[in-house]
Amino acid sequence: MKILFIVDPLETLKPGHDTSVALMQAAARRGHSVWAAEVGDLQVHHHRAAAQVRTLTIHPGRTPFYTVEAVGFYPLSEADVIWMRKDPPVTSAYLWATQVLDLVNAGRGDGRTTFVLNRPSGLRNDNEKLYALHFPDLVPETRVCTHRQDILDFVDIHGRAVIKPLDGKGGEGIFLLARADRNLNAIIEASTAYGTRHVMVQRYLEESRQGDKRIVLLAGEPIGALLRVPREDDVRGNMAAGGRVVKTTLTERDREICRVVGPRLVADGHYFVGIDVIGAYLTEINVTSPTGICEIDVLDGVVLEDEIVDWLVEYTRPALARNL
C-alpha cells in the first residue's frame, strides 16, 4: 500500500517519541510505501485534491530516520491511505486542509476508495476539549465561558479548578485556579484574552496528583495505556510539560469509559484516538495526533505500531471497492 502521512516538518519529528515516526517505521517494515506531506503542500488542482509529496526511505535506529528519495506532485487519490497527523493547534490552515481531504474521493471513476483517517469532517467538528462533553456522565463538573465572574463563581463553588484553552496541546496554557491565589484575576484575563476567548474550566481532581491516564483506542477498542505523573511543582502530567510516564493497567472504570465512547468515536470517523482519564473521569479526547505509542512500547514490551498498521491493512483491504 501507499500510505501518505500528513505531518509537521519531518525534521521536527523525534524518533523514539513521536507516534508518527513509529507508524512510518511500522509501515516500512511491512513493505508499504511511505509518503509524507505537510498541510502547506495540499492543494486543489483541476478540481482534484493533490499535494507535493515526498517519497521516503525509512531508516530504523538512525538520525535522521528518513531519506527523501523523490518529490512529486500527485492527486491524493494515488494514495491507498492518508493519515492526517498534523499536531494542534487547529488553525484555519488546518481546517482548510480537512476541506481538501474531503475531496480525495470526489469524482473518481476507478472503483477505488482512499481511506482517510481520522475522518476530515470529524477533525473539523470535534474539538479535543469539547468532544468529551458529549458524555456528561463521564466528565467532571465543567464550564465553558469567557466572563471572569462566571469563572470566579465556578471556583467559589468547587474550591479549586483548572482552566484550559480550547485549542491547546501538551499542557500549554493550563493553570490551577484558587481563590487564595493573588494572580487569579491575571490568569483569567490572560486565558480569556480579557473576556474575548472561550476557555474550559473544570473542577480540580485531586487524583491528578497520581497522574492522568492516556488510553489509546484503535477502532473504538483500547489497545494500550500509560500514566503521566506531574512533577511535584506542576499540575500538568503531559510529557511535553515535564511529566514522567509510568506503566499502568486499565481499571474496570477505564474499560467502562471505553465501552461508552468507543462506538461514538467510530461512528464519527475517529479510528485512532487517545483519551485522557483522571481517576474516574474522562477529561479529554485527542483525535488530531494522539501520541504515547513509543512510551507504551517501552513500558509494556509491545510493538503497538505494528498492530495498528496490521489493522489498517485488514480494514482497508475491501476499501478499494467500497465507499468509506
UniProtKB/Swiss-Prot annotation:
The enzyme's E.C. designation: 6.3.2.3
Gene from which this protein is expressed: gshB
Molecular functions (GO terms): ATP binding; glutathione synthase activity; metal ion binding
Free-text comment on the cofactor: Binds 1 Mg(2+) or Mn(2+) ion per subunit.
The reaction(s) this protein catalyses: gamma-L-glutamyl-L-cysteine + glycine + ATP = glutathione + ADP + phosphate + H(+)
Pathway assigned in UniProt: Sulfur metabolism; glutathione biosynthesis; glutathione from L-cysteine and L-glutamate: step 2/2
Protein name from the UniProt record: Glutathione synthetase
Binding site for Mg(2+): 284, 286
Residues passing through the membrane, by range: none
Domain ATP-grasp, residue spans: 129-313
InterPro entries: ATP-grasp (IPR011761), ATP_grasp_subdomain_1 (IPR013815), Glut_synth_pro (IPR006284), GSHS_ATP-bd (IPR004218), GSHS_N (IPR004215), PreATP-grasp_dom_sf (IPR016185)
Short name of one Pfam family: GSH-S_N
Residue positions binding ATP: 155-211
Similarity field: Belongs to the prokaryotic GSH synthase family.
Gene3D superfamilies referenced in this protein's UniProt entry, alphabetically: 3.40.50.20, ATP-grasp fold, A domain, ATP-grasp fold, B domain
Cofactor: Mg(2+); Mn(2+)
GO cellular component: cytoplasm
Keyword ATP-binding: yes
Keywords from the UniProt entry: ATP-binding, Glutathione biosynthesis, Ligase, Magnesium, Manganese, Metal-binding, Nucleotide-binding
